[in-house]
């Protein structure tokens, strides 16, 4: 049995066009059960100011970013389904979707799946890691009926 629990926090003034809680759960369920059958994830939707502050504090990057992933780290003897937190910047997602000629929904789905894979320990710093992670993202997104998010970059 698999179960995905979502704690959705909306900390942005403009909520128009945000995905529904059901959409977020669909995207989480597309990736998490195959890795961690019972998972609890917090998704916090923020504006550029909060994203910028967190990105500067935790990554040393002086700009807002699309998604930040904060894995929950419990002591080994504590078994909790808490996977971690995803902080997603609404404005950056919308801007990137436009720049990449994707629908906003498609890019939201990509950012949730991308962030979840980070929570699960995947990364894209090294080329081989990036290839593996991008392959998983593409496979999951295509199962959901979305295009390969890296198609533009590959052409």
Swiss-Prot record:
It comes from the Bacteria. Keywords: Cytoplasm, Endonuclease, Hydrolase, Metal-binding, Nuclease, Ribosome biogenesis, rRNA processing, Zinc. Its EC number is 3.1.-.-. InterPro entries: MetalPrtase_cat_dom_sf_prd (IPR023091), YbeY (IPR002036), YbeY_CS (IPR020549). Binds 1 zinc ion. The keyword Ubl conjugation does not apply. It is found in: Cytoplasm. GO terms for cellular component: cytoplasm. Its cofactor is Zn(2+). One of its GO terms (biological process) is rRNA processing. Zn(2+) binds at residues 114, 118, 124. Belongs to the endoribonuclease YbeY family. Single strand-specific metallo-endoribonuclease involved in late-stage 70S ribosome quality control and in maturation of the 3' terminus of the 16S rRNA. NCBIfam families: rRNA maturation RNase YbeY. This is Endoribonuclease YbeY.
């Amino acid at each position: 049995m698999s179960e995905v629990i979502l704690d959705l926090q909306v900390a942005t003034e403009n909520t128009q066009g945000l995905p529904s809680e059901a959409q977020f759960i669909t995207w989480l369920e597309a990736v998490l059960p195959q890795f961690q059958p019972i998972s609890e994830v917090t998704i916090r939707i923020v504006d550029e100011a909060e994203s910028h502050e967190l990105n500067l504090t935790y990554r040393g990057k002086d700009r807002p970013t699309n998604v930040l992933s904060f894995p929950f780290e419990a002591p080994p003897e504590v078994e909790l389904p808490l996977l971690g937190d995803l902080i997603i910047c609404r404005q950056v997602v919308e801007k990137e979707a436009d720049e990449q000629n994707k629908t906003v929904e498609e890019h939201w789905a990509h950012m949730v799946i991308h962030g979840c894979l980070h929570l699960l320990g995947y990364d894209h710093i090294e080329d081989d890691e990036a290839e593996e992670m991008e392959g998983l993202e593409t496979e999951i997104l295509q199962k959901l009926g979305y295009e390969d998010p890296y198609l533009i970059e590959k052409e």
